[in-house]
UniProtKB/Swiss-Prot annotation:
Assembly: Binds RNA.
Species in which this protein is naturally found: Candida glabrata (strain ATCC 2001 / BCRC 20586 / JCM 3761 / NBRC 0622 / NRRL Y-65 / CBS 138)
Name this polypeptide is given: Heterogeneous nuclear rnp K-like protein 2
PROSITE patterns per record: KH_TYPE_1 (PS50084)
Cellular component aspect of the GO annotation: chromosome, telomeric region; nucleus; P-body
Region (Disordered): 194-214
Lineage: Eukaryota, Fungi, Dikarya, Ascomycota, Saccharomycotina
Function: RNA-binding protein involved in the correct localization of transcripts in the cell. RNA localization is a widespread mechanism for achieving localized protein synthesis. Involved in structural and functional organization of telomeric chromatin and regulates silencing at the HMR locus.
Keyword DNA-binding set for record: no
Annotated Pfam families: KH_1
Membrane-spanning residues: none
One Gene Ontology MF term: mRNA binding
Similarity-based family: Belongs to the HEK2 family.
Domain KH residue range list: 2-67, 120-185, 244-324
């Protein structure tokens, strides 16, 4: 089964994976001949790059295990911890200690524990929010099972990466364990997609959840607001003169009504809570664009509406952006669940 995984890297990490004259990344290709692996171009002013690895499941997971090994290799003058301006590059999980390892394996020798500690690494896996819901599972049962089964640590970012529907799943463990947990993650995602396709095919109304059409990948970039002032590659742009921060979120047409709420109340509450202005792009020939029908689920042929968030602080704009994306993800999941129920009712009829 072919898969493609994307990993978020800092500039230092990307340089380490590439190696002198590309030798390190070439060694990963040589060890896993059936994968395509590459790193996005360096964007001036951005502190991150994205590694993409594609191929058969086993080969891709094995190659990413090799990437963890490369990242674990110490570099000259490398600081133990780097603090990054870009939130997603800072580790979500605490650095493991000898005491942590002793607690899980009290019989192990000091030498063995030191060796194990040196082998523990990280991967920042980029995952669509819809897929992450399946990985976490109901009540977090699925992700707990993965942690216990493979002896790794897993944590997901609450926020979406800028201008995307992706979140970060950080994996901490030894390379072999990270490889195994990635194999299970691939299986979970494949099973979920298979069930969704089956439910869609069996649904007499042919209703789409809109999941795949509106997934948006993250790419390293600098955002700009209407005054063309650039920002760090966080999730907002800003104007130095007015201290005004902005962000844009693209929402599928068929979900606009649900996110606006009855007579725009849901959007009004979001504005009030985050202390931001949220401007919704009008539909063509639509003068009353705030009063959308929250139950409108008409197919939209991929049309998107732009929501512009404006605030006096990056924190409030980030909060509004994240909450808007989360509301969209919740609505997509709600419609997905309704589709499943329709399919189950059809089977029992």
């Amino acid at each position: 089964m072919p898969v493609s995984h994307r990993i978020l890297l800092s500039l230092k990490e990307a340089a380490k994976v590439i190696g002198t004259q590309g030798n390190s990344i070439q060694s990963v290709r040589d060890n896993n001949n059936n994968v395509k692996i590459g790193i996005s171009e360096k964007v001036p002013g951005c502190s991150d790059r994205v590694l993409t690895c594609s191929g058969e499941v086993e080969d891709v997971c094995s190659a990413l295990g090799d990437v963890v090994t490369l990242l674990n290799k110490p570099s000259e003058n490398e600081e133990e911890t780097d603090n990054h301006h870009f939130y997603f590059l800072n580790h979500l999980l605490p650095v493991p200690t000898l005491d942590d390892l002793k607690a899980t394996d009290p019989e192990a020798s000091e030498e063995a524990l030191h060796e194990q500690l040196q082998n523990i690494g990280y991967l920042r896996l980029l995952v669509f929010n819809s897929q992450l819901s399946s990985i976490i599972g109901k009540g977090g049962n699925q992700i707990k099972s993965l942690i216990e089964k493979h002896g790794v640590k897993l944590v997901a970012s609450r926020a979406f990466l800028p201008d995307s529907t992706e979140r970060m799943l950080e994996i901490q463990g030894v390379p072999s364990a990270i490889k195994q947990v990635l194999l299970d993650i691939c299986e979970i995602i494949a099973k979920e997609e298979e069930e969704e396709e089956k439910a869609r095919a069996e649904n007499n109304n042919g209703e789409s959840t809109g999941r795949k059409r509106f997934e948006r990948k993250y790419y390293p970039h600098l955002q700009r607001n209407n005054t063309n002032s650039s920002s760090n590659n966080g999730s907002v742009g800003n104007s130095a003169n007015s201290q005004e921060y902005t962000a844009t979120v693209m929402i599928p047409e068929s979900y606009v009504g649900a996110l606006a709420g009855k007579k725009g109340n849901r959007l009004a509450n979001l504005r009030k809570f985050t202390k931001t202005k949220i401007l919704m792009e009008s539909r063509p020939n639509d003068l009353d664009n705030e009063h959308e029908d929250e139950n409108d689920m008409e197919e939209d042929d991929g049309r998107l509406r732009k929501f512009t968030i404006i605030g006096s602080s990056s924190r409030s704009v980030n909060l509004a952006e994240s909450m808007l994306q989360r509301n969209l993800a919740t609505e997509i999941e709600r419609r997905k669940e309704r589709l499943r129920n329709l399919s189950e009712n059809n089977e029992s009829a």
